[in-house]
Amino acid sequence: MALQFTLNQDAPASAAVDCIVVGVFADKTLSPAAQALDSASQGRLTALVARGDVASKTGSTTLLHDLPGVTAPRVLVVGLGEAGKFGVAPYLKAVGDATRALKTGAVGTALLTLTELTVKARDAAWNIRQAVTVSDHAAYRYTATLGKKKVDETGLTTLAIAGDDARALAVGVATAEGVEFARELGNLPPNYCTPAYLADTAAAFAGKFRGAEAEILDEAQMEALGMGSLLSVARGSANRPRLIVLKWNGGGDARPYVLVGKGITFDTGGVNLKTQGGIEEMKYDMCGGANVIGTFVATVKAELPINLVVVVPAVENAIDGNAYRPSDVITSMSGKTIEVGNTDAEGRLILCDALTYAERFNPEALVDVATLTGACMVALGHQTAGLMSKHDDLANELLAAGEHVFDRAWRLPLWDEYQGLLDSTFADVYNIGGRWGGAITAGCFLSRFTENQRWAHLDIAGVASDEGKRGMATGRPVGLLTQWLLDRAA
């Protein structure tokens, strides 16, 4: 964890921490904790705000030192923007801004009082849970492969959260741990995070907790199951594939929820080789797998009273003389044959076998998560995942969960009129659908392997990682999925 978290009910003026975090609205109205500090300092905070020494616009932070009558040597004032517009997004931004302001420097411990604020259509427990997940996300530092590069070890280590709801704190910490677990896997370079490494890491986590278990299928076992589609993608790589199966048994005899995550640990594109200007980011093509593993971590840590199964086909799409080719016809585990139109449309080829495998668990609901198409990113950008399902109830559950935690998805159609774009002369289905509607035709392809399931597909190509040299894995949609499971456990 990037941070350690505690609950704190001390009066702000007497809290024994390095820094107190309070807020101020654009109209110069102080948050309740800020009012308490203002009273303790005999109006000092009000005076500083009035003369413009403390900014109140959204995104601003002002660090004050030695406020009279306040035990903490520092007070961080966070701008909250207009009071009438204050809601979910401004609250989450304020928490993140505060954490980033204290990420480096002399402050080791802080008390976050922003949880006392009223957020429209949310309760105090939500405030605490989201404060934990957002602040841990903001404080995250990647260090796994830095070698001799110096890491700034100063800054915030412990964040006390104003409030008394221990369960809300525990769920927030569990979710944050799941997000961070997923981000760490996603950020690792592909020479580290191979299919075997991903499998070993997931199994090692499951082995630490009663009620959790892992099964790792190797190439021979997958071949015996008839997973010809998945294994075709794996043929060109020296890093052999694994099928990761994780189980959390928290719900007695109830049917499990099943998450399937695309785990392409690096995607060259295969024979249809990717070009420079994007291939260097293809280590993130396993983020669907990383994020369903992260959701498993959150579920186990929160001890949710449900049954959960996670399935991750972990494969590297590489090139050698044995690599699969465009125009190959391969046979999936379902028995359906697939004509390969493009070897860079490999995610759906590993997912179709994993989805077929998942049927054996008799899922209450089946959701796959994948960085599946650039087309989804073109359509929706980096702000939202794409959601496809023929089951309105399931789609609405996922959409509501995403809205609740601001890890949102947007529903795209999955109409039968698109299915004809996948017709093949030489096989049951073609693995690409042409230039138009690429995200939707990818979803249509997967729908052919989930016909008897209550199923939804999340295309996370736009939200799984930040772009550019300094970009990192985001851990999305661990928040959405964890909230969805929390709702099912309620």
From Swiss-Prot:
Catalysed transformations (reactions): Release of an N-terminal amino acid, Xaa-|-Yaa-, in which Xaa is preferably Leu, but may be other amino acids including Pro although not Arg or Lys, and Yaa may be Pro. Amino acid amides and methyl esters are also readily hydrolyzed, but rates on arylamides are exceedingly low; Release of an N-terminal amino acid, preferentially leucine, but not glutamic or aspartic acids
Binding site for Mn(2+) 2: K262, D267, D285, E346
Subcellular compartments: Cytoplasm
Annotated keywords: Aminopeptidase, Cytoplasm, Hydrolase, Manganese, Metal-binding, Protease
One of the GO biological process terms: proteolysis
Cofactor details (free text): Binds 2 manganese ions per subunit.
Primary subcellular site in the record, as a coarse category: cytoplasm
Keyword Hydrolase annotated: yes
Keyword Manganese carried by entry: yes
Matches recorded under Pfam families: Peptidase_M17, Peptidase_M17_N
Gene Ontology CC terms: cytoplasm
Disulfide bonds: none
E.C. code: 3.4.11.1, 3.4.11.10
Database matches in NCBIfam families: PRK00913.1-4 (NF002074)
Role description: Presumably involved in the processing and regular turnover of intracellular proteins. Catalyzes the removal of unsubstituted N-terminal amino acids from various peptides.
PANTHER family: CYTOSOL AMINOPEPTIDASE (PTHR11963:SF23), LEUCINE AMINOPEPTIDASE-RELATED (PTHR11963)
Name listed for the protein in its UniProt record: Probable cytosol aminopeptidase
Organism this protein belongs to: Xanthomonas axonopodis pv. citri (strain 306)
